[in-house]
Amino acid sequence: MARGLKKHLKRLNAPRHWMLDKLGGAFAPKPSSGPHKSRECLPLILILRNRLKYALTYREVIAILMQRHVMVDGKVRTDKTYPAGFMDVVSIPKTNEDFRLLYDTKGRFCLHAITGDETKFKLCKVRSVQFGQKGIPYLNTYDGRTIRYPDPLIKANDTIKLDLESNKIVDFIKFDVGNVVMVTGGRNRGRVGVIKNREKHKGSFETIHVQDAAGHEFATRLGNVFTIGKGTKPWVSLPKRKGIKLSIIEEARKRLAAQNAA
């Protein structure tokens, strides 16, 4: 008789955006319980071993973590399968490196290097705003945080700017038409654009129409949209392509141009 959760994860069942090779063994690291869903996170072992190449083996990753060299959102993490997720700040003080976990235009996690003031905050999407015991208002964020006494103007689907040292809300962005967003789910994951229109369907999910900087329009669900700035200016720096997805033909032309130039 099965008792509790599975403790293993087969490599073929691992999320595609982890980019694990098929011949690297039968198993993949199973993410621990944490602030992000198991299929929407990147375990620390994959960050250190597969992405940053600071370790060659599983044991080397454990040795690095046990020396307390890795911090996620300003807290030391020693769990090798700790689930880091979208917008998390991964810091390695020994090498003076800081990264923010974002999506590239192909929907895969990328470690985007950040510096200065950007390492001191993260953006959090508000899941719900409720009242607790004795009428105390609080909000829940997408990464499992509960923050009491928020600004009364903050509603569900808005984005808050959270100071990682004090864990206090510094500022917030309303989920409005005209603000810049990043898509965090579905086939358009990783694309960045400005909200053009909101379609409300009674008894069904809301559809959001987004236009990117290249003028391409696409639609996605409300739950897949994460506001990252006011107007067209994002509050966080973006990866190389700035969230603009190229079509297959545009990518082929770009490759040909690069080959001809070489």
UniProtKB/Swiss-Prot annotation:
<dbReference type="InterPro" id="IPR014722">
    <property type="entry name" value="Rib_uL2_dom2"/>
</dbReference>
<feature type="domain" description="S4 RNA-binding">
    <location>
        <begin position="42"/>
        <end position="104"/>
    </location>
</feature>
<dbReference type="InterPro" id="IPR018199">
    <property type="entry name" value="Ribosomal_eS4_N_CS"/>
</dbReference>
<dbReference type="InterPro" id="IPR036986">
    <property type="entry name" value="S4_RNA-bd_sf"/>
</dbReference>
<dbReference type="GO" id="GO:0044391">
    <property type="term" value="C:ribosomal subunit"/>
</dbReference>
<dbReference type="Pfam" id="PF16121">
    <property type="entry name" value="40S_S4_C"/>
</dbReference>
<dbReference type="GO" id="GO:0005634">
    <property type="term" value="C:nucleus"/>
</dbReference>
<keyword id="KW-0963">Cytoplasm</keyword>
<dbReference type="GO" id="GO:0003723">
    <property type="term" value="F:RNA binding"/>
</dbReference>
<dbReference type="Pfam" id="PF00467">
    <property type="entry name" value="KOW"/>
</dbReference>
<dbReference type="InterPro" id="IPR038237">
    <property type="entry name" value="Ribosomal_eS4_central_sf"/>
</dbReference>
<dbReference type="Pfam" id="PF00900">
    <property type="entry name" value="Ribosomal_S4e"/>
</dbReference>
<keyword id="KW-0687">Ribonucleoprotein</keyword>
<keyword id="KW-0689">Ribosomal protein</keyword>
<dbReference type="Pfam" id="PF08071">
    <property type="entry name" value="RS4NT"/>
</dbReference>
<keyword id="KW-0699">rRNA-binding</keyword>
<dbReference type="InterPro" id="IPR032277">
    <property type="entry name" value="Ribosomal_eS4_C"/>
</dbReference>
<dbReference type="Pfam" id="PF01479">
    <property type="entry name" value="S4"/>
</dbReference>
<dbReference type="GO" id="GO:0022627">
    <property type="term" value="C:cytosolic small ribosomal subunit"/>
</dbReference>
<dbReference type="InterPro" id="IPR005824">
    <property type="entry name" value="KOW"/>
</dbReference>
<comment type="similarity">
    <text>Belongs to the eukaryotic ribosomal protein eS4 family.</text>
</comment>
<dbReference type="GO" id="GO:0003729">
    <property type="term" value="F:mRNA binding"/>
</dbReference>
<dbReference type="InterPro" id="IPR013845">
    <property type="entry name" value="Ribosomal_eS4_central_region"/>
</dbReference>
<dbReference type="GO" id="GO:0019843">
    <property type="term" value="F:rRNA binding"/>
</dbReference>
<dbReference type="GO" id="GO:0006412">
    <property type="term" value="P:translation"/>
</dbReference>
<dbReference type="InterPro" id="IPR041982">
    <property type="entry name" value="Ribosomal_eS4_KOW"/>
</dbReference>
<dbReference type="InterPro" id="IPR013843">
    <property type="entry name" value="Ribosomal_eS4_N"/>
</dbReference>
<dbReference type="GO" id="GO:0031369">
    <property type="term" value="F:translation initiation factor binding"/>
</dbReference>
<dbReference type="InterPro" id="IPR002942">
    <property type="entry name" value="S4_RNA-bd"/>
</dbReference>
<dbReference type="InterPro" id="IPR000876">
    <property type="entry name" value="Ribosomal_eS4"/>
</dbReference>
<keyword id="KW-0694">RNA-binding</keyword>
<protein>
    <recommendedName>
        <fullName>Small ribosomal subunit protein eS4</fullName>
    </recommendedName>
</protein>
<dbReference type="GO" id="GO:0003735">
    <property type="term" value="F:structural constituent of ribosome"/>
</dbReference>
